[in-house]
Amino acid sequence: MKKVEAIIRPFKLDEVKIALVNAGIVGMTVSEVRGFGRQKGQTERYRGSEYTVEFLQKLKVEIVVDDNQVDMVVDKIIAAARTGEIGDGKIFISPVEQVIRIRTGEKNTEAV
């Protein structure tokens, strides 16, 4: 199993969620995060003053899937989240040793 973590623009969440649900993904976790990369923040105006926001609002979408679903999930996220502009985000994939459903004790694929 793998965990797919995608850092995306907040306004792209609905498109990403719909694409994943339509592909059969039944669960995901979404967290509000802040960060910067090549985009390095942005200048904003507030009450006539300019200031630089260094850490930009993003969302982190986390999904645990079987190894054979990873490429499909990544493709769906990219297609739904891409604007073509700097700041579209990143996708990280990491191994998951074990998943346990607390309520039933089910493990691994049955727990996802």
Curated annotation (Swiss-Prot):
The modification O-UMP-tyrosine is found at residue 51. Transmembrane segments: none annotated. Gene3D superfamilies: 3.30.70.120. Phosphorylation dependent on the nitrogen source and spectral light quality. GO terms for cellular component: cytosol. PROSITE patterns: PII_GLNB_CTER (PS00638), PII_GLNB_DOM (PS51343), PII_GLNB_UMP (PS00496). It holds the Pfam family P-II. Coiled coil: none annotated. The modification Phosphoserine is found at residue 49. GO terms for biological process: regulation of nitrogen utilization. GO terms for molecular function: ATP binding; enzyme regulator activity. Keywords: Nucleotide-binding, Phosphoprotein, Transcription, Transcription regulation. P-II indirectly controls the transcription of the GS gene (glnA). P-II prevents NR-II-catalyzed conversion of NR-I to NR-I-phosphate, the transcriptional activator of glnA. When P-II is phosphorylated, these events are reversed. In nitrogen-limiting conditions, when the ratio of Gln to 2-ketoglutarate decreases, P-II is phosphorylated which allows the deadenylation of glutamine synthetase (GS), thus activating the enzyme. PANTHER family: NITROGEN REGULATORY PROTEIN P-II, NITROGEN REGULATORY PROTEIN P-II HOMOLOG. Homotrimer. Belongs to the P(II) protein family. This is Nitrogen regulatory protein P-II. The gene is glnB.
